[in-house]
Design a protein with these regions (language model features):
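C-terminal motif of bacterial Sec signal peptides marking the signal peptidase cleavage site
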Residues: 17-20
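Short S/T/G/P-rich N-terminal loop/turn motif that feeds into the first structured element of a domain
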Residues: 22-226, 230-247
Length: 247
């Protein structure tokens, strides 16, 4: 299984966790090391500083995932086309680089107007801009109604999970009841959301405070049973990444 081999290959690597943002994401510069080398998951236990948690905030967020031939070239092209995004009511938020493939890029932008965002996603000029930046293959584009769960602490090593659920409200109740269990197993809640067109399609973002414990818990029978009880249908689709840039 891909996930099992990923876990076995990553779980023993030494640790470097960088402090990242809260729900509103503090502004940082691009991670220059990650721009030139592949990203690896690090096994560590991290105890971040714990400021007072903020109240949950909400936003509409477009998430785009695609592979690039060269991250530096793509990043320059992405920055070059910022005015095109702004004109469509899209605002830079987070850029992530995949683990173990650091050329598998995730872009999250905040959305002012969903109609404009949908039109932007279908605009031929976007396709041309992506081709210029070295995007390989078709991008995966989704728009979520997102709730940021600012816990006052986070690391830049994260996992984004896509799932299908029977009922959003029932799933959300079950998810909230498992907060302490996740915390005890090296995971911190970052955000949850559902597709603007179908609230049975959801996303969950967690950050790792202990990568070995967190990875083990995500693959555990306990997690599988909790997901089943919460009404998750089928297998989750997980994207492991580190935050390369925030805005």
């Amino acid at each position: 299984m891909k996930q099992r081999s990923l876990y076995l290959s990553l779980a023993g690597i030494l640790a470097i966790f960088l402090t990242a943002c809260g729900g509103k994401e503090e502004k940082t510069t691009t991670d220059s090391t990650s721009m030139t080398t592949d990203t690896t998951m690090h096994t560590t236990t991290t105890t971040p500083t714990t400021p007072a948690p903020a109240a949950p905030t909400t936003a509409t967020v477009m998430v785009v995932k695609h592979k690039v031939a060269n991250f530096n070239k793509w990043m320059a092209s992405y920055d070059e086309h910022d005015s095109m995004r702004v004109a469509s009511g899209l605002h830079n938020f987070v850029i992530g680089r995949g683990i173990p493939d650091s050329n598998m890029v995730m872009v999250a932008v905040k959305v002012d107007d969903t109609a404009k965002a949908k039109a932007f996603a279908k605009d031929p000029s976007l396709k041309k801009a992506m081709q210029k930046g070295g995007v390989i293959g078709a991008p995966n584009i989704m728009i979520f109604n997102t709730t940021f769960l600012d816990n006052g602490q986070a690391t830049n090593l994260r996992v984004m999970t896509y799932e299908t659920v029977k009922d959003w409200d029932a799933w959300k109740t079950a998810f909230e009841s498992g907060k302490q269990l996740r915390t005890d197993n090296g995971l911190m809640d970052r955000a949850i959301g559902y597709d603007i067109n179908d609230n049975h399609k959801i996303s969950v973002v967690l950050s790792f405070t202990d990568s070995a414990k967190g990875m083990s818990f995500l693959k555990s029978d306990t997690m599988k049973k909790r997901m089943a009880a919460a009404g998750v249908v089928g297998q989750p689709n997980r994207y492991y990444y580190h935050v390369a840039k925030t805005y």
